[in-house]
Amino acid sequence: FQRTPNWYMPVPNYHERVPDGMRWLFTHVPHYAQWYRFWLFWYSCDAPLEMARVDPGWPHKDRSVGPMNEWVRELMAGYLHDQFKDRPDLLEKVIPNYPPAAKRIVLDNGIWPATLKRDNVRLVTDPIAEITPRGIRTRGGEEHQADVIIFGTGFQASRFLTPMKVRGRGGVDLHEQWDGDARAYMGITVPNFPNLFLMYGPNTNIVVNGSIVYFSECEVTYIMASLRLLLEN
């Protein structure tokens, strides 16, 4: 059951074994691993930003937000056309109608298209109307029988730490202070809540670029430095 299709970026070697030659370089060439990590950082953090840059005078705002965004759209649309050239019925359902980078782009090595084209898989885009004793009924009236239903309905992105109740100095409630607008310094610390450090906190979510692993490491470095300052002073 699909509410909104995703854009897919072709990554042929995704989850593949690291080649022996590169493994040798990691082991024997000084600082090669550090250089490669820096290259990955640049490639995944800085390079994609141009793709999301909005050109105010761009004439095709119904499909993209600028020339680089349009280029990426053509690249990914071509990938989908190639993957589903034998299934035009699916191609119509998987092409998004919004600009790339408006939602997270999925990295794909061909597994997702191959899964959708299996004989025992059916992609339903008709909105869900209700859950029934036998499965799911869509808005068009069709009932789809199911033994197991997995709810992938999204996230309450601004309700951090829910359902926990967190109280700070003077008994102030964290969610009442935020009042639906979660904010934190560097996404980590919050006024009136001493000794509270957040990981993956407000406004640190990534959509266009970056690695949550790297961002988490930066947050841990900041938190450890803060704890050291507290202990030493």
Where in this protein do the model-derived segments appear?
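N-terminal FAD-binding dinucleotide-binding subdomain shared by FAD-dependent oxidases/monooxygenases
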Residues: 1-233
